Each structure stands twice: as C-alpha cells, then as structure tokens.
Amino acid sequence: MPVDKFLARAGGQRTLSRFQDSLCDFLATGSSRSLCGTSLDFPDRVLVCTEGPAGMEEASSPSFRQATTVEGMVSPEDPTLSKEGLSAKGPPPSPVLPPFRRKCRKCGICPQEEEKSGFSLRFGQRPDGDPPECASPEAFAGPPRLLSSKDTEPGEPGGSWVECAVETEVENMLFSKDGVAPDSLDHLFEFPGLFGGEPLSLVTQEPLQSPALYPEVLTEDSTDQQEVQPAFVVGSPGTPPDPVGPEDKAQSGSRMELEQGLSAPANSCASSPEPLGGLDGAPLEQRRPTHVKKRPWTSPDDSSQDHAEGASKKDFPRLEARVPRGVKTVYYVYTGSGIRLVGAASSSQPGQIEPLEELDTNSARRKRRPTTAHPTPCQSDPSETENAEPHQQRAEDPGEQGMTPLDAGVRSTVVRAMQEVLWTRAQELPDLALREDEVEAIAEGIEEALFHLTQDTNLRYKNKYRSLLFNLRDPRNVDLFLKVAHCDVTPNNLVQMSSIQLAPKELSRWRDQEERKGLDIIEQQQKELYRLPASKLTHKGEVEIPRDLDQMLTLEDLMEPIVPRECSLQPLSTPLEDTTNWHQHHQCDSNCQICTGGEEGRKADDGSQPELQVDISYNVDRKSSTKLPAFSGVIMNREENAIQKAPGPAPASSPEVLKVGETPPKEPQDRLQMPAGLKNAPPSPPPWEGSLDMFSIKHFRAKAQLISGHSCQLVQALPDVIRSAGRLPPSHVWDLLDSMGPSKAKDICVIRLCPHGSRDIQNYRLLYSYLNNKQCHCLATVQQVKMVLLPLPAFEPLPARLRPLGGPGLEITHTSLLLAVLFPKDALPDTATSIPVSNKVPKTVSFSKRVERILYSPEDRRSEATSSPLEEDPKQSLARGSLAPRSVCAPQSFPRGRGRQGPGWGQWSPEAAWCYSQHPSSAGPVFPGIGQGQHLHRASCFHHDLLQHLKVLVTMSHQFQASLWPQSQDSLPPSTVVSAVPDPPGPSLGPMDGGGSNCPPPEGSDPLEPPEHEC
C-alpha cells in the first residue's frame, strides 16, 4: 500500500500534512546536529559502514548488520512495535509537531536498545535541495546519533512510540514507484508486499556534489571491487537476503516477516558477530566494537546561525567507536545506477579519504619491497597502534601512496645541490653551451633515477649521492662531466656506475699501480718463505732450528764420492794454467792455488784424501821419468803436489780415512822422501781471520775468502774484531758502489765470510737469519775500510752489480752465506804493503837499482853473493813484503834501451838480455852434471829447453817453501841446493858452455846476434 494512502486512511489529509512538516523540521535540525564540525562536502547519500578484511568469517548471529550513514540512523527496533499496534493505533491528533521533538535532551545519545538497530538509513539532503552544511569523516567514525522513543514526550499529543516509529521510518526513507534498472542495486532496498504488494525503491534526487573527490564513482570498473562489501541487510536476522538469486526476494516478501524483524528483542548482544552480506552474496562477518567513549560534540542551536558560532555555544557528548586492529571504515555513495565505493577514512590525516587496495596485491607488495626506514609510531596510544599498519603500507610504495614531508625535503636538497655543482662546472667550461634549464633538467633526472634505484632516502641513497657529487665536482674528472652534459651517459646508467668507473683516469692508473705493487710484495714474501730456514718461537724469541751438516752439503759435495776412482787417475798432459809462479809478485790472486787455499781446505773438511791424489801424481811421474832425470822429476813432483794439495791437513792416518776403510797406498821405495816439515805443514792462512761481534748475537770467529776483486789490500786492513755500526737499506750499498770513481773501484773486493769452526756455525746462521728477515745490510765499524755485510740465500747468484769486479765468483750450488763488500777510504795504513795483482810485471820495483848493479857490475855481484840473503832472518824478509829470499825470488828487469849496446865487459847481447828477461832467476842452483855459470843456447837447443824447465821448477820450489815455513823458526830447513849464487862469467866476451869453456862466436856472424853453438 502506498504511503500516502496509508496516511490518508490513518488520519486523513491533516495527518499527511503534519507528517510532511515534521519531516522537513527533522531534516533541517537533525542534519545540522549530526554533521557539525566537518570540513569536506560529501555526497548527499553516503553510507558509512565498518568492514573487516575480506575472507574473515566468524560465528553467525541472528542480529542485524551494523550500518552507519552520513547524517543519522533510524532504529525501528523496539519491543513495543508490533503488527497489532501498527494497524490499530493511528497517528496522533496534534496539529503541529515540534521541530526538536525527536532529540534526546538528556544526554544527546540514543538509548542502548536503539543502538542495536539492524537497518537504519539517513539522508543529508534537505527538502529544499540544499546540500548539507558539513560532512566530515570524523562524523562517520563512530555511530551517529539515533532517534529514540524518548524523543516523544509522554505528555505530548500523539506521543506514542508506534506513531514515532512509523513517522521516523518514513521520514528517513523516500520511496518511489518508478521502475529500477536491471543493473541497479536498488533491489536490496525493495520491500515487496509491505505496503500493498508494490515494490518500493530508493530514490536518488541529485547527482554527486564533488566528483573530483570520488574518481571511482565515475568509472564502471569500480563496481568490481569485492574486497569490502556494503553494509545493508534487509530481512529477518536469521535469513539474510541474497541479492543475486531472484527466488530470495520471494522468500522475504511477506509483511509478517518484516514486522517480526522490526520487533526483534532489544537484549541482543551488541558485540556478537553479525552476518555480513556482500554484493556477490559471499557471507562475511563483522564484530561490533564493544567499547565506546563519549566526547563532546558541538551542535548549533539554530540551523540558520554560522557553524563556528554554533559550535561554541553548546557541547554534546558523542559516541566514538574504536575500530579494532585490521578494520577500516569504508564509505559508499548512492548513485542512480547503484552503490559506489568511495574509499576508507585516513588514519594518519583526519578528514581525508584514501583509496583501498586489494588484499592480495597489498600483501604481495609488502613481501617484494623491504621495510622502509621510517620510524614506527608510538604504541602507547591505541589509536596510533591501530594506524601503524596502514602508515607502513603507504610508505612502502612511494609512487602510489606519496612521499612524506621528510623525503620531499631531502630530494629537493639533492636536486638543488646537484644543480649547483653542474652549473658551476658549466661556467668553468665556456665552450660548453649549456643553459640553466638544461642543467636543472639533468639534475632532476639524476635524482629521479637515484630515487628509483634505492626506493627511499635511506643510507644507500645518501652515499650514492655523495659519490656522484664528489666525482662531478672534481676538476680532474672532466670526462665524466662532459659525458653527463652531452647526455652520453643516461641518468640510469650514471647512478649504477661503481666508484672505480666514476673515478678519473689518473686515479684509476694509480690504483692499478698500487695493486701491482701489493701483488709483487705478496709474491716476493711467498718466495722468501721457502728460502728461510725453519724457526721456532721460544722464551728468548724466534730461534732458528739448527740443521744437520748433511743438509748443508751442496750438490757438488754429494756428487764427488760418486765419481769413479779410475776417472780421477788420468794423467795431466799439460801443466795447470795458473799464476802460482808469480805468487811472489802479489798477495792474493784468484787464479793462484796458494791464494785460494780456502777451496782446498773446504774439500779437505768434506773428507777428501789428499794422500791418494799425491799418489796419482807419482804415477804420472813414472811415465815422464824416462824423459827427465830422476832428480828433476822428484823435485817437480814434490813441488806440484805440494802446491796443489798441501792445504789439505788430513794425514794418511787420519780417523776419517780409517773410518772409510781405505788404507793409504804404499809409497815407492826408489823415490825421495818429502821433508818432515813439508808433510806436517799447516794450510796457508786465509786473507783475513778474526771474529765478528754483530748486534746482540754472540761473537764468533770467521775467516774470509775472496769472491770478487783483484786485490787483497782491503782484506788485510781489516781488524781482528769487527763490530756492527747499524743497519742500511739495500739501495744504499748500490748507491755507494756507483759513487766510487775508477781509481777506487779497482780496489773494491767482495769476500765470503765462513765460520771458523763447528762452534761458530750456529751464531753464523743467527746473523744470516737476522739480516735476511729484516731485509737489510749491516754496516761494520772499520777505521780505514768501509765494510758492508749482506745476506745471500742459497742457490742465488752473485748480485749483478758485483759481477764486473771479476774474481772466481761463487759456485751455483752454494749454501746460505754472508758476503762482505769492502770499499776503500781516502788513505790506507802503511802496514798494507801489498801490490795490486796484474797480469803484467810492473815496470819498476823497489829494488830495481840493485838489479841493475847485479846485471852490469860483476864485481858487485860477487860481493853481494858473499852476503847472501839466505843468512837473513825469514821474518825480516817477510816483513818487507816478500815471501821468499831475495836471491831466489827477486824479479829482475832490464831498463829500456840497454839491450842495444854492443857486447863487451859487463854487457850482454840483446839475445842474452832476452834470455834473462824470460828467466828472472839468473842465479840458479848447481846440480851434478851441470857446470857452473850461465850457458845461453838457441831456442831450438834441447839443453836450452831443459834448463828453462828446471829453473821454473826451482823457483816454484823455493816460493812454496818460503810460504809454508813457520814464522817461529829462526833458520831455513836444510836444502839439497849447494849454492844459489852462480859464479860470475869469465873475462871472455863469449858465452860459456856447460863445462865452463868459452864458446867463441863463428866467423862472419853478427856480433848483435847470439852465437850459434852446436851441441
């Protein structure tokens, strides 16, 4: 039955007019009371409902679903409302309804039984069509004020609740008979059979007031949002309607069912879960909040007064519902075609509406993006706790949700700083035509790419910004700035470049060099680890583990016992090419076997058998004894064996030889025995022997062996004790070597320091390990010589800077040793009277005048023969620098031009002078079978060759005897030589033969040429 017919039957035309007046008064006063204090203009018909997450279901309850509208709610639920009361009681007879009749004047809120309404609608449109004064989400947050039965005073006419309920229901709902579009959702609000069986639909009067605030209303795709559902349920509590199926409308179409629903008991639990009906028919449940709080709600007394003035006049308490965690307040709008979703109330910004997101999309985005560095809201306030999760979700997606003011300030600062740097660099390059707007665009593009890369203004964002700013501001990095200015590098590629790629070329080149140096140092350290000896840490520090003597042997020492004995018995076809016969002219020579006695001494220490090698030379003597006389062969063999093998001190009966099990061979009985003094003679002394006192290492004895150089002059100037003066870097030694002039460079020599005995080996190794680990050289304190000690690891060759000095050098398979480089100073002491070694005989010597007297004055020679140097003490002879008696080893030389004089008394022919120059020992011993005096022969004469050979052997014999003779003895050993001074030649002008007879020169011969003598 239509409403107008129903009212006409109940009270006539008067009742209908009073109803219309009451409706206008209610809409004029109720909207101003419920919507005061709002700042936004919402649509006329907005429904506010409390929704939970989609898919959450709870236990069903027969109560209705809560619905909240923008402008008020009507609760038709009352136990007094029944079918009989509705049909029996008519409208009140009062002519005019008061405008504030339905307002609760006691507390401004609705009673508890009216708060449990299952269906309530309210409109904000006034009858005259004006929009509401204010509409704010704050007004929608809590349950709005509901109409109560108490608004009808008992004394007032027509104050029954039945009349109030009917009027309230009609006042808040406008129905129309017009048809509904097929796609409209107005069928949710149709009440078939309620008033005469005609369906009633909701009437939409005006379009939206502000379409810009609700963009989703203008799109048809927004109707597909199914995450949140509308909050309307029409029908009985037990059977919520299904808006899809048409048969559901028939089930709830009876008037009796609606009346039973309206007369539901008022004591239903307000906090019980309620069924939630959606647009798609999916059942959802929502728990109504159980805690509400009152707070003042200002309302104007008169609707015509201003809102600010009215708000200050009167305050009313308001119900504020606390939304549980995870629940949002959702706003809908009624349109001509249905209900549109507006959005949810913003928890961080009051009075604003934020768009909703799909739950699946939001959760997936939360998993993909890391949590931002924004501070978490304080948990002390429950309202802030409930709003923490939406705030975090909005901050995770800056593009969709927007930036915070802090992020916006940081980004603007970065753009401004980048623009200033680029513009400053552009001013430094006048050739670069770059406008200010272009610079600003480049800076904004770089910042946008940087923010897109980091997705936040976090620490990574700031570090990358500083790196870009530093490299763009660097004046040396012009290439990077030009690439950015010419857009050769895009902003996306620029922010993804590493610090090495952004750096200038000079810095990159320097980094590469430093990396190579580091790698070289690491490789060198790894190589040195294999060369260093094993060491251990004790309470005294790092101590080197001593090795056995077998481990110190070289490959050459290990290969010597393997050589077969027959291979070493080969005869020597030619004599050794050495300078032993010139030993009287030098102090130390690398080619002299006497000077390099350390090599033979080392072989003797390794267990070699010198007596066996002496016997080998005797076998050679037997083969050559047929050519030479017996006496000459014996002397030559003795001298050669003594020179080559005498440094070996081990006798034939030494324990080492007996330990091996070899017996010394028997000497032949027909040969002469060596003197006892030569057999037991000690080895030749090394160039230097003393002790070393270096750093904190205990001093030890050592001896020197020449390695490089041609002079032992500096070696002999060394003191007995050498002490350390400090450490030097390796480069200092080479600089000192380069600073030496040519005159001093010839005196530089390198010696090898060897431990003197087994007790000194450990300290010797400690000194080597110390210098090798420190990678330094040791400077010694010597007054007249600059001495530098340097370590040389095993199997390493001599440094290339020391090889040009000459000398024997080092063997390839040598152990770890200490080398000493000796540099000369300004002056040397007088004690070092040795002469540098030279391949040629010096032109002048200290006794050249005496030699001339001997050669050219026979009387003087005879007088000198009486005072033979044999009577002189050997110590005095050695003190003058000669190791042999002067009568035997004195070199003789002729002055230039003297050989061209004619033969006469006291003068010799040039050939005779040449013969004497070849044989400096003019006074040779007299042997049986050879006459006294000198007998000069031709070069082709057999006796001439024999005489030269014998003279050389005699000279070598006396040199060796003088060098081996101990200094403690006062007299020379007995010699088989009868006289070392020959008789002077006779008065004849010609030479003498072997028997002392004169050999007259043949007729017609040149007197300047030597006479030919047929033998």
Swiss-Prot record:
Residues 304-320, 388-397 have a biased composition (Basic and acidic residues). One of its GO terms (cellular component) is nucleus. The keyword GTP-binding does not apply. Pfam families: SPOC (PF07744), TFIIS_M (PF07500). Residues 73-97, 118-159, 213-320, 344-406, 643-685, 858-906, 967-1015 are annotated as: Disordered. It comes from the Eukaryota. GO terms for biological process: cell differentiation; DNA-templated transcription; gene silencing by piRNA-directed DNA methylation; spermatogenesis; transposable element silencing by piRNA-mediated DNA methylation; transposable element silencing by piRNA-mediated heterochromatin formation. Protein adapter that acts as an essential executor of PIWIL4-piRNA pathway directed transposon DNA methylation and silencing in the male embryonic germ cells. Recruited to young transposons, which are specifically marked with histone H3 trimethylated at both 'Lys-4' and 'Lys-9' (H3K4me3K9me3), via its association with SPIN1 chromatin reader, and associates with the de novo DNA methylation machinery and repressive chromatin remodeling complexes. Following this, PIWIL4 engages with nascent transposable element transcript to direct piRNA-directed DNA methylation. This is SPOC domain-containing protein 1. The gene is Spocd1.
